[in-house]
Amino acid sequence: MSTTRYDIISDTHGFLSPELIEQLRGADVIVHAGDICSPSDFQHLEMIAPVQACLGNNDWSNDYGPTVKARKIFYGSGLRWQVVHFRERLNLLKCDVAICGHTHTPFVTRDEWTGTLVMNPGSPTYPRRSKPSMGRIICDEDTGEVLSAEIITLGE
């Protein structure tokens, strides 16, 4: 079985902790749901793995290149992925996996109406109602199945 590891982050706000960098090593793809707040951090992430990212409400003055916009749609592991900063802007009818940020509060769930996997990885920098966190999704490349989706608490 061939798998792909997607490491999911959001709301790093210009700081990539050593614990976060260590967790990201070995990722096949890094998905960032906005509020990167640092072009140099974005470049650092790109040195670890390919990055699929969207802009957050604090990113508009930064230039991360032409592929980073308010909404990121990409295909990976046979699945349609959608990444936006605000959960309210997700269109769950048009994706299999939906990633959001902004609240700094982690969760992972399946939408009961569409069956879409929805994740907010929380924030590794400024968590709210939780500890610093990120997400991880493992997909089967042959079947397009999500094998696991979890929130990882950093620093434990």
Regions found by a protein language model. Name each.
Residues 47-49, 94, 114:
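Short, structured coil segments at secondary-structure junctions
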Residues 1-51, 59-70, 131-133:
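N-terminal active-site segment of His-dependent metallophosphoesterases
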Residues 31-36, 55-58, 77-81, 106-109, ...:
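Glycine-rich loops and low-complexity Gly/Arg-rich segments
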Residues 8-10, 29-35, 52-57, 82-85, ...:
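Active-site neighborhood of phospho(di)ester-bond hydrolases with catalytic His/Asp-centered motifs
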